[in-house]
Each structure stands twice: as C-alpha cells, then as structure tokens.
C-alpha cells in the first residue's frame, strides 16, 4: 500500500525545509527531486497555499507521484482581488469587492471539491467565504447577494456560465 504525505506549500516555492523535508526525508526519496516536481506542478498557483499529496508508489525504487489540490476558496478570492489578507473586521471594514463573474469563476474551480450539487450552490458557498473575509459582492453585503441568487436575479449569468463548459 502506498505511503501518502499531505502538505500545504506555497505555489511554485516549495523548499527542502519544513514542512516538506522532515515529512519526506524518512521515506527515502530524493528531497530535491520531490521539491522540483512540486514546484513545477504548483507554479500556476504562485503566491497561494496549495494542498499537495506525495504518493510513494514503490519505496524500494523510490518512485512517487504528486497530486496537486485546488487552493482553499479564501486563497482564490485573495488572488482574484490581489489582496494580502481578509479583513480583521469583516462586517465593518470590507477589503475588496467581487463581481458575480469572479464568484462564478472561483466556484467553477472549486465545484469538484464542494458538496454543492450545482454551480449556483457552489457560488453561494464562495459568497459565504467572501462574507467571512470582509469581501463584498457586486458592491453589496454578501448575504444580500445570496438572497438575490435565491430569487433568481442571476439565473441568466449562471445559465451562460454553464453553457460555456
């Protein structure tokens, strides 16, 4: 049975130091080779924390493969808005604003990892994360936008986004 090591690394900037080195050193793998593979696989997520699985397929032959997960929703929102972090007072001092198009873009990236059955439901999850980060949506309180989604205000936008797939 293959051994699996799960770590959270900065996209494109994994290094042999902690948390990676100590986790994979005991497995007998070439740490530099693993780090290089991870950096190659995560370079598109530069500046974001990315979940990575290192699967040791054959410890004797030292063969492994890398599986890159999708960064947390909060990381995708920060990257989309170009902000360093969420608000320390989410209700009183918003740090950015997402458009519905941006919400749908993030929801499409994350939908396979969410429990949401539809793009609409996944978008509402993204909006919930935006709320906790102090990010408005369409210039409004995210809860208001979630109600508008329930009322069908953005149905045309969702239909267009689902056709594009």
Swiss-Prot record:
GO terms for molecular function: large ribosomal subunit rRNA binding; structural constituent of ribosome. It holds the Pfam family Ribosomal_L11_N. It comes from the Archaea. The keyword Nucleotidyltransferase does not apply. Keywords: Ribonucleoprotein, Ribosomal protein, RNA-binding, rRNA-binding. One of its GO terms (cellular component) is large ribosomal subunit. GO terms for biological process: translation. Transmembrane segments: none annotated. The keyword Phosphoprotein does not apply. Disulfide bonds: none annotated. SUPFAM superfamilies: Ribosomal L11/L12e N-terminal domain, Ribosomal protein L11, C-terminal domain. Forms part of the ribosomal stalk which helps the ribosome interact with GTP-bound translation factors. Belongs to the universal ribosomal protein uL11 family. Part of the ribosomal stalk of the 50S ribosomal subunit. Interacts with L10 and the large rRNA to form the base of the stalk. L10 forms an elongated spine to which L12 dimers bind in a sequential fashion forming a multimeric L10(L12)X complex. NCBIfam families: PRK01143.1. This is Large ribosomal subunit protein uL11. It comes from Thermococcus gammatolerans (strain DSM 15229 / JCM 11827 / EJ3). The gene is rpl11.
